[in-house]
Every structure is written in structure tokens, then in C-alpha cells.
Amino acid sequence: MPSLAELTKSLSIAFENGDYAACEKLLPPIKIELIKNNLLIPDLSIQNDIYLNDVMITKRILEVGALASIQTFNFDSFENYFNQLKPYYFSNNHKLSESDKKSKLISLYLLNLLSQNNTTKFHSELQYLDKHIKNLEDDSLLSYPIKLDRWLMEGSYQKAWDLLQSGSQNISEFDSFTDILKSAIRDEIAKNTELSYDFLPLSNIKALL
């Protein structure tokens, strides 16, 4: 059985090479080793520098797991990884809470909720985030799902569509939800069109959809 260090190195190489299927195979044995070493769920009462360094590595492993799950469209797995990252991201320990992937993964989590049409949980999570992250909408990544939700709620489907078209702001993972959300917009337009018009020419329907 390879050591935790060897498995982690293999995971890093697979992720950098875009081999997300290999990542998914490596992650279960890595998580077993993390559990054995009391690292999967951080004990924030331990202030030992060596332990804190180890849990920082654990955080990066979980982030790789979350991003690999998005790339393989395994959204249930993504949600599990994100929930495991929450104790890190919302820790009072600055070192644990900060990450260059934090905004991206929170945004992906919100997009995942929107794609499930789980607006109740979306707004509940948004309230929580608003208490823990200052000026949410000033963050270009976090503002993406927030604007999308607002425009869908307002019925500003063209704005929402244009945002999805412009898409990803160079964040390829956002595109994992684009088709699902575009389909939701089409369904809403079709439903509203059916309610609004007794008769509508085919050419007009094509323009709306």
C-alpha cells in the first residue's frame, strides 16, 4: 500500500495532467489514510504547527477532489467534498480559511444549487455567506451565481442567458452547469409564453427559445 505522501503526490500529478478519472480512483484510499491520521475532519483545538500544516494539505486534497468531481459531472461527490471543506473555509483560523480556490468552489456550490432548482437552500446559503464574507458581490466569481439567481428571479431571462453565454470568465468549471441552466431558462420562457399567449407564430417561438 503506497504511503499517504506517495498517494498525495500521484493525485497532484493526475490533477495537473487533467486526468480526473485517475483522481477519483486515488481519492478514496487517500481519504482512508487521512481518517487514520485524524486529518479528514480538522480538530481546531490543536494549535501544533505540524498538525496545522498537515490539515492545510488535507484542505488542498479536498479541493482537488471537489474540482475533479465537477470535471467528471459527479455533482453528489462535489457536494460531499464542499461540505467537508466548510470547516476550513469558515474557520476562525486565518490560515485554514484562506485559499486561492475558495471563491471558485463556493461559486460552483451555489451554481450546483441553482442547477437543482434548490432556491430555498441557495438563499439560505447566501445569507450564511453574507455573514462570513464581506462585500460578496465585489468578488467577480461569487457575483456570477448571485447575478444569475437575481435575473432568473426577476424574469430577466435575456440577462441571465447572456451571462451564461459569456459564461465562464475563464473558469471552465462554470461551464459544467451552463447547459442545465440554459435548459431551465428555456423551460421558464416556454411556460410563461404558454400562459401569456393564446396564439404565437412559430417564428416568434423560435426567437424566444
Regions found by a protein language model. Give the residues of each.
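Alpha-helical scaffold segments of alpha-solenoid architecture
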Residues: 82-209
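N-terminal alpha-helical interaction modules that lie
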Residues: 1-88, 148, 158-159, 163-167, ...
